[in-house]
Amino acid sequence: MNLNLSITDMAGATIEHSIIITNFVNMVYNQLKDSTCRVFPDNVQYKWILSDGTEKTVIPDASINCQIRGKRGNSFINAPQFVLEVLSPSTEKYDRTGKKDIYCNEEIPEYWIIDPKKRVIEVYDLDYVDDKPQYFLVDTIAEENKGGLNLIHFPHIKIDFDVLFSGIE
């Protein structure tokens, strides 16, 4: 039995953090209704074996998974097709480095980082350099360029910037 586990204690989410996650999940849910894919809020965990052999449990703020049978117990063991993290002062560094690296190594095709204070969305797309996965910032969405906000790998899914941030003062 391998007990080489890694647990990261994270502070509780702010109300703004939860509002953005709820708004995102609500927008995407209906658009995936006739699909094999599902959108999940931040109560779903993924367990992966990292390249160094340690098992890592990660709970994204939101994810879209099209292989929902890939579970072990209460955890998904496959990689989702999309993950989203909402920044907070206590998680920003980890979301931008640790989680981003884990998601990249698990080859998750698309990663969004949302800054609720600045009302900015960073859109990262996975590509390969010398056969190694790497995220590239393909867009930064803010109030001034908010039109046409779509997921790269789910182009039929429309995200309304104003709805995403509704309820945030």
Predicted regions and their residues:
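Gly/Pro/Ser/Thr-rich low-complexity, intrinsically disordered segments predominantly at protein N-termini
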Residues: 1-169
